[in-house]
């Protein structure tokens, strides 16, 4: 597995943090300076921690562990779904519904409902219903697909969760901590690294930055899955 280079990270803008006035002092070890009121992330640290996280997920994938990618902000949503699917993992990229992990039995029943409706759509049952009833069920199907589509193949709680934008996904973070699920988080300078088992300091607003980090983790998972 090829390591990410400093040049790649510079080109992707991984080093650009948030405005200095909004920083979290706990991120100080991962910041090397500031420019024009913006904190600059220490890419040497990013490379080291990304390598550690990649080794962790590679070994977990070798053991058949399950991964859940979470990222609901616009810049991350498409990346989260495409990279999770590429490495045969699960994802949430629209909105985190309270209890997705801590109330997993209820979520499982909603996923079953989604699968049942998809089967009814596939075999034409929905189209044969009265128009009003069909419309209601199709709207329900669209909503379930939007929020739970990335969890359809998740049979049990994930072994590892990968998060983009800790502050936005704090509800998911709290659920993972409560359940003892390891968290790998892409952390900008306004985040709290103590809430992640494997923090990766990086710009969580730029699409290229998010894509670079998440794709490297997906590469490692994919590689690990191929080693049986």
Swiss-Prot record:
Keyword check for Ribosomal protein: yes
Official protein name in the record: Small ribosomal subunit protein uS2c
Entry keyword set: Chloroplast, Plastid, Ribonucleoprotein, Ribosomal protein
Compartments reported by the entry: Plastid, Chloroplast
The UniProt record lists the keyword Transcription regulation: no
Lineage: Eukaryota, Viridiplantae, Streptophyta, Chlorokybophyceae, Chlorokybales
Family of the protein in this entry: Belongs to the universal ribosomal protein uS2 family.
Main location per the UniProt record: plastid
Cellular-component GO terms for this entry: chloroplast; mitochondrial small ribosomal subunit
UniProt cross-references to InterPro entries, sorted A to Z: Ribosomal_uS2, Ribosomal_uS2_bac/mit/plastid, Ribosomal_uS2_CS, Ribosomal_uS2_flav_dom_sf
Alphabetized GO MF terms: structural constituent of ribosome
Gene Ontology terms: biological process: translation
One Pfam family here: Ribosomal_S2
Transmembrane segments: none
Gene name linked to the record: rps2
Organism name: Chlorokybus atmophyticus (Soil alga)
């Amino acid at each position: 597995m090829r390591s990410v280079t400093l040049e790649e990270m510079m080109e992707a803008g991984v080093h650009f943090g948030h405005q200095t006035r909004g920083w979290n002092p706990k991120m100080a070890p991962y910041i090397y300076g500031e420019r024009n009121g913006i904190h600059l992330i220490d890419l040497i640290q990013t490379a080291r921690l990304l390598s550690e996280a990649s080794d962790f997920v590679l070994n977990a994938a070798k053991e058949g562990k399950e991964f859940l990618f979470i990222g609901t902000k616009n810049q991350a949503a498409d990346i989260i779904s495409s990279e999770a699917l590429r490495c045969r993992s699960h994802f949430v990229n629209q909105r985190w519904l309270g209890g997705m992990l801590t109330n997993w039995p209820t979520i499982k029943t909603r996923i079953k409902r989604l699968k049942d409706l998809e089967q009814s759509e596939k075999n034409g049952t929905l189209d044969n219903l009265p128009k009003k009833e069909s419309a209601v069920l199709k709207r329900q199907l669209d909503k379930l697909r939007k929020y739970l589509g990335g969890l359809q193949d998740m049979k049990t709680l994930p072994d590892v969760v990968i998060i983009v934008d800790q502050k936005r996904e704090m509800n998911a973070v709290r659920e993972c901590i409560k359940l003892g699920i390891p968290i790998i988080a892409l952390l900008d300078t306004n985040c709290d690294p103590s809430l992640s088992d494997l923090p990766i300091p990086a710009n969580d607003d730029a699409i290229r930055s998010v894509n670079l980090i998440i794709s490297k983790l997906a590469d490692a998972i994919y590689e690990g899955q191929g080693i049986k």
